[in-house]
Regions:
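C-terminal, charged low-complexity interaction regions
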Residues: 114-233
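Zinc-coordinating Cys/His ligand positions in small cysteine/histidine-rich zinc-finger domains
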Residues: 49
Length: 233
């Protein structure tokens, strides 16, 4: 990835991106467990406390295995494609049983993920928070009205696929000095930009008014995190 410095002052570097406590380390966004080696240069990082960093680790490994099982429709580690997932299962064999118990099986035999899976939602919320912080945007709606839509095999639904890549226009400008505003100035238009962290593995897009975050994982799973408009129910 291209290096994207930030010049704003609205987000102190010593405040944890996730809990608001003292940040004594940094966290990669996305977590490396969702990427494959060799990693690209200039991976995005955000300030984080060690407690949050460690607490998210097990859930992230679980989600990485969950996504691999459902994407490939198998629980056989010998059929897994991602080396990182294979290593997780070798190190923690019991994780496969945990994943299998949490996966839903459809009438046609296909496996699918429960979108209300608590561990999945926790990790997705973390990713959304990290992307908002990295772009220098407000995270307040995460605590007051976040809705997460989770989709599988997005390429099979043309309408959904177009929705993901449709531009998110905004009438509001991001904070001065933020990465989001710098990208806007370079592009010359007030719409969000897609950033590819690793081709075929992870890309994301953040609305300039911080109202929405879109993520595509493994070129298969789609995530939309957005504000809930309580006025419309």
């Amino acid at each position: 990835m291209l290096q994207r410095p930030e010049y704003g002052e609205g987000h102190p570097e010593r405040v944890c991106c996730y809990c608001g406590g003292y940040a004594d380390t940094v966290d990669h966004v996305p977590s490396k467990v969702f990427l494959d080696e060799p990693y690209p240069d200039n991976l995005p990082v955000v300030p984080c406390c060690r407690k949050c960093n460690e607490e998210f680790s097990l859930d992230e490994e679980y989600v990485a295995v969950l996504l691999e099982c459902v994407r490939l429709q198998t629980f056989d580690p010998y059929q897994f494609k991602r080396e990182k997932v294979i290593k997780i299962v070798k190190h923690t064999p019991a994780i496969l049983s945990t994943v299998r118990e949490s996966v839903l099986q459809l009438l046609d035999g296909h496996y699918t993920i429960d979108s209300e899976n608590a561990r999945l939602k926790r990790v997705l919320t973390k990713l959304i928070a990290g992307h908002l912080r990295f772009e220098g945007l407000d995270q307040l709606f995460l605590h007051s009205g976040l809705k997460i839509d989770f989709y599988q095999d997005i390429h099979t639904n043309d309408e959904l696929f177009r929705r993901f890549y449709s531009p998110i226009n905004s009438d509001l400008l991001p904070e001065v000095g933020s990465r989001a505003l710098i990208a806007l100035v370079k592009n010359g238009y007030a719409r969000s930009q897609w950033f590819t962290v690793l081709p075929g593995r992870y890309e994301y897009c953040v609305a300039l008014d911080n109202s929405e975050v879109r993520i595509i994982i493994q070129d298969f799973f789609g995530v939309i995190g957005h504000k809930v408009d309580f006025r419309n129910g």
